[in-house]
Amino acid sequence: MAKKGNDRADADSPWKMILRQYFQQAIEFFFPDIANKIDWNIPVAFLDREFQQLTPDSEVGKRFADQLVRVYQKGGNSIILLIHLEVQAEPEDIFPERIFTYLLRIFDYFHQPPISLVILCDNDPEWRPDRYGFTTFGSSLQFNFTTVKLLDYAERWEELEVSQNVFATVVMTHLKAQEMKRNVTRRKEWKLR
């Protein structure tokens, strides 16, 4: 069981590094409609310290893939953008609830609603969480969040090969790693291509 946690921490670390380095390209690649509404002339602010205070349970070993970023809309309004990367290999039943909990904590702290974006990196084509809700004695709540599934990019391989966005290469590498998980020799050959 501890092995899974270490695998997850190891997988999260490269994601966090590349997200920080190429944040704009990530949003442009995975969430182009949102990218078009952001004023990229104003520097983004990574709110790591604030996010750690809000979500002390988000640290598991070296796991820090969750990103809380302040960006500005075209026109000057500040928005909080929550990027949550789901890089674990197994679907997790409480994942939508966790995204909702993050939303509540961020809203409570900043007094403005965040945008929750999720990149699903697992290999289960059926697992596609995008909402959390409940109804109890006449009270109800429905929270929807935006997701992309890396598996879906497998059908767009030719498009990825010609893309100039660094995340096209990241996605191709991720998909090939999943495809060749048990074939180390083939994986090494593909990486050296």
Residue ranges and their predicted role:
Residues 1-193:
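Conserved single-residue anchors adjacent to enzymatic active/cofactor-binding motifs
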